[in-house]
């Protein structure tokens, strides 16, 4: 199993929290770009798609946002 597959499996398992770096890596694998900003939110953009805004608290992302990301990327079971 490749690192990409392991990352996707880890996010699809819907933990209560995930590291922001893992979420960022996943979105970038699917062609999204992180728009740098200040504060506690990061915006990911992709041409032709609505922006995904991800709030970060203590370098972690909550499950509700992981659910939205999985739905937008088509990773739902």
Question: How would you name each of these model-derived features?
Answer:
Residues 2-38, 44-77:
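Basic nucleic-acid-binding interfaces
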């Amino acid at each position: 199993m490749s690192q990409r597959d392991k990352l996707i499996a880890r996010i699809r398992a819907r933990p209560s929290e995930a590291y922001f770096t893992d979420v960022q890596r996943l979105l970038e694998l699917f062609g999204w770009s992180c728009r740098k900003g200040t504060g506690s939110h990061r915006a990911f953009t992709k041409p032709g798609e609505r922006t995904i805004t991800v709030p970060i608290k203590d370098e972690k992302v909550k499950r509700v946002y992981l659910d939205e990301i999985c739905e937008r990327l088509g990773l739902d079971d």
